[in-house]
Amino acid sequence: MKQKKYAKMLYPSPIGTLSLIADKQYLYGIWVQDQTHFERGLGDETIEEVAGHPVLEQVISYLDTYFEGSVQDLSDLPLAPIGTDFEKRVWTYLQAIPYGQTITYGQIAQDLQVASAQAIGGAVGRNPWSILVPCHRVLGLGNRLTGYASGVEKKAWLLQHEGATFQENKK
């Protein structure tokens, strides 16, 4: 069986180095280096670090614009999810959360008619496209800052960058 080959570019961002991975046609992920679920699902596939790549250059342009404080529509960017049908359903829902706005895990569970907000949290945590599919816009009960695969301090930075409102957790 032939091994799949992926291209990888690293992107320095205000929240840490991002690992961007695609094949010739699809974006497979944007991960903060060493986050939970880092490069999940790629297995023993060949990943080659490259200096340029058409899909990844489109993502870099988006990230540059995002970190400068504005957004662009990337709905036509070809995403290739590696996950369960349930996870894919949650990730599709996340894409509709507008810049600078938030929603709770419980509200997503209610909207998707899922009994458990924790199940939603698990799927949100395995989102392979940090920032692009905005899992950082999902908050806990009472709009509290909770879980983020690369750390809640990075989630707080992204939400503040977007001007979103949230409740800090008391220590």
Regions found by a protein language model. Give the residues of each.
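Short Lys/Arg-enriched helix C-cap and helix-to-coil transition segments
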Residues: 132-139
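Major-groove DNA-recognition helix of helix-turn-helix-type DNA-binding domains
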Residues: 124, 128, 132
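…primarily DNA-binding HTH/wHTH and HhH modules…
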Residues: 141-171
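Helix-turn-helix DNA-binding helix
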Residues: 119-120
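Basic nucleic-acid-binding alpha-helical/helix-turn surface characteristic of O6-alkylguanine DNA
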Residues: 1-114, 161, 165-171
